C-alpha cells in the first residue's frame, strides 16, 4: 500500500475492486482514498473522501457504489457519503435519524445495507438502521437492547458493543467480537425478514476488538484484532 500507514481505516469492494480510505496514525486523521485492482496488483489514488478526515467510520459496497459514514474526527459523526467508481465522484447523502457513532459495523443483505452498534460520547449505541438505495432513505429497525415490553429482546443487551465485526451467510448476518469495554465473544445472528436477533455459538478465539471479517461461500471468517497491547494474527 503506497499511502501512509494508519489504523482504524475502512474498506469496501465494488465490481471486483477494493477501496480503502480514512484512518488515523496516532497524530493525524486521514481522508485520502485508494483503489486496489487485484488483476494488476496495483493501487491507484482516487478522489479524496469529501467529509472531514476521520477514523472509526463504517463502510459498505452497495449497487455498484461505495458508502462511507459516521466515525470520529475529534467529534462524533453521522454524516454519510456515496462514491461512484465510474467517475470517481462523491456525493453526500441523508444521514440516519439516530445517534452519531464511531466503531459501528455494517453489512449488506439483498441490496439493503444495515448499520448497528458503536459508541457515542460515553454510551453504547442501541439504535439500528437500514439503508435502501432505491428509496435513498434510512429506515429505523428494532433496537438492539432490551427496550420493549416483549420477551424477544430480553437478552439483547449483550448485542451492543463497539468495534465488533459482522459478515453475511445465506441471507443472515452474524455479529461477534468487540467490547463494552469488556471484550466480548458472544455472537448473534440477524434475520432481516423478521427483524430479529438470535444468540448463536460464541467466538472460539481469544476475545478481541478492532478485528476484520468477511464471508466466503457458507463460512464466515474473523481475522487479526487486538486485546489491550496484544495484537493477533490468527484467523
Language-model-detected regions and their locations in the chain:
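Kelch-like beta-propeller repeat domains
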Residues: 1-235
Amino acid at each position: 500500500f503506497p499511502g501512509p500507514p494508519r489504523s482504524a481505516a475502512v474498506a469496501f469492494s465494488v465490481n471486483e475492486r477494493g477501496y480503502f480510505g480514512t484512518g488515523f496514525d496516532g497524530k493525524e486523521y486521514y481522508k485520502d482514498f485508494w483503489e486496489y485492482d487485484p488483476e494488476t496488483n496495483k493501487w491507484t489514488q482516487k478522489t479524496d473522501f469529501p467529509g472531514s478526515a476521520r477514523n472509526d467510520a463504517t463502510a459498505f459496497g452497495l449497487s455498484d457504489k461505495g458508502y462511507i459514514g459516521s466515525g470520529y474526527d475529534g467529534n462524533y459523526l453521522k454524516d454519510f457519503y456515496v462514491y461512484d467508481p465510474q467517475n470517481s465522484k462523491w456525493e453526500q447523502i441523508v444521514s440516519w435519524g439516530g445517534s452519531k457513532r464511531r466503531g459501528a459495523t455494517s453489512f449488506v443483505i439483498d441490496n439493503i445495507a444495515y448499520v448497528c452498534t458503536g459508541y457515542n460520547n460515553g454510551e453504547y449505541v442501541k439504535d439500528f438502521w437500514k439503508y435502501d438505495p432505491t428509496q435513498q432513505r434510512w429506515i429505523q429497525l428494532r433496537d438492539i437492547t432490551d427496550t420493549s415490553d416483549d420477551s424477544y429482546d430480553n437478552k439483547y443487551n449483550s448485542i451492543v458493543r463497539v468495534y465488533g465485526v459482522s459478515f453475511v451467510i445465506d441471507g443472515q448476518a452474524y455479529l461477534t467480537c468487540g467490547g463494552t469495554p469488556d471484550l466480548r465473544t458472544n455472537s448473534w445472528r440477524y434475520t432481516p425478514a423478521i427483524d430479529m436477533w438470535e444468540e448463536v455459538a460464541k467466538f472460539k478465539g481469544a476475545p478481541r476488538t478492532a478485528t476484520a471479517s468477511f464471508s466466503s461461500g457458507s463460512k464466515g471468517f474473523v481475522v487479526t484484532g487486538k486485546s489491550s497491547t496484544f495484537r493477533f494474527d490468527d484467523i
